[in-house]
Design a protein with these regions (language model features):
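Catalytic cores of alpha/beta
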Residues: 44, 90-103
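Glycine/Thr-rich beta-alpha phosphate-binding loop at enzyme active sites
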Residues: 33-75
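Glycine-rich phosphate-binding active-site loops on the catalytic face of alpha/beta enzymes
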Residues: 101-118
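Intrinsic disorder/low-complexity detector
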Residues: 1-47, 122, 127
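C-terminal helical cap(s) of enzyme catalytic domains, especially alpha/beta-barrels
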Residues: 114-138
């Protein structure tokens, strides 16, 4: 399977280990597709050998199955790009990053600058996440 070459993307830090990349819909459509995982696919059973990018689709912003898929893929040790596309809103960005997404293609009516401003409010989290499952209080006790 051929995976996408790195895209020119606007990238910024949100205070966590993985920077979240914003990919324009034009760049996403022009890129070679990664592994496209259907919403009803079991992320526990997909083969990850030689996969560099996995595309997870949000058919509606209310459909949260891709959050679970991203979380499972990170827990399985996948370190490549997990990209969200479809009906993706800026309101979902923090949860996407914490679930394991590394790049997003926002819905056309969403404002990237507004999303960055919203994300800047969160420097750290008390709970664990897909990348760092240990809760904050347990790290301090160690």
């Amino acid at each position: 399977m051929q995976c996408a070459t790195p895209l020119r993307a606007q990238q910024f830090e949100i205070g966590l280990d993985m920077p979240l990349q914003f990919i324009s819909s034009t760049e996403h459509n022009a890129a070679t597709a990664g592994l496209v995982l259907a919403n009803d696919a079991d992320a526990h059973t997909v083969t990850l050998d030689n996969v560099q990018r996995i595309d997870l689709h949000f058919p509606k912003f209310t459909d949260g199955r891709a959050f679970s898929q991203a979380f499972i893929l990170r827990r399985r040790g996948f370190t490549g790009d997990i990209r969200a596309h479809g009906d993706v809103l800026i309101d979902q960005l923090v949860q996407m990053q914490r679930s394991g997404f590394s790049s997003v293609v926002l819905r056309d009516d969403q404002n990237i600058e507004h999303g960055k401003k919203l994300l800047s409010h969160y420097k750290s989290f008390y709970q664990g996440d897909a990348i760092h499952p240990q809760p904050h209080f347990a790290k301090e006790a160690a």
